[in-house]
Amino acid sequence: MGTPSELVDKLMSDIGAIADDIQDYVRHPGADFTRMRKMGAGDVIRALVCMGAGTLGHELDGFLEAPKACTPSAFCQQRAKIEPEALLQLLLRFGPGVPARAADARGIRLAAVDGSEVVMQRNPRDAETHSPKSNGSGIGYNSVYATALLDMAGGAFLDAVVQPGPAKDEPAAFRELADRCDPALVLAGDRNFAGYNNFAHCLERGVGFVIRLKDSFAARLLGAGPLPDEADEDVELLLSRSRRAELRADPG
C-alpha cells in the first residue's frame, strides 16, 4: 500500500471502522446517532478530515449529493455529538498504516516532535481556550495547542496531543507521546522539550531521543561533572540556643 488511491481507500476504511463503533465516541451513548439523519457519523468525520479552509456553508455545498444536502446548523449539531477521542483514534489507526521508507543502516527511525498553536473562532464564553491577550486588538482569541509526532521516514503523523492554548504544556505533551509511541522510534525535538524530567522519562520507557539544548542548559549539563555513587552525605550540625557570634565561629 503506497499509491494515493490506496491511501485514500485506507483512510475511508478507517473512518468507516470508527463510524461503526461511534457509540464509543459520542457524548451521549445510546442517544446520539441512533436515528437516521442526512449526515451520519461517518459523513461528519469524513467532512472534518477532508474539508478545506472555506466557510462551512461553502465546504458543505457539494459535499453530499443534493437529496442529502445538510445545512451548517445541522452539521454543527451532528459534530457536537462526537468526542475528540474519535479523531485521535482515527489518527492512531491511519498513521502507522502509511508505509515508511526503510530505516538507516543502523536501523534508526526518527520521529519529529513539534507543537503549533491553532487559532479558532473567538468565543469568550469558552474559558478553557480563550485568552484575553492578543496582538493589540484587546478582544482576545481562542486557540488550542497541538503537539504532533511525525514519522520522518514515511512522512505521516503518528500521534498528537491537543491542549487548551492558554494552558499549553509542551514537556507534558512530549511525555504523553513518548508513553504511546513505538519504543523503536527515536524522538527528535527542539529546545522547548529539553528537561531532565523528559530525559528520564524516555530512559525509563526505553525510547531514544535527540533534543536540541539551549546554550545555558548545555553548559550546566557539561559542567556538572561525574555523579557520586550515592546521594547520602555526612554533615556535622551544631544545635544551640545561643546566638553568640563567638560560639558560631568556634563551637568546640
PLM features per residue range, with description:
Residues M1-G252:
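Conserved, well-structured functional cores that handle cations and Mg-NTP chemistry
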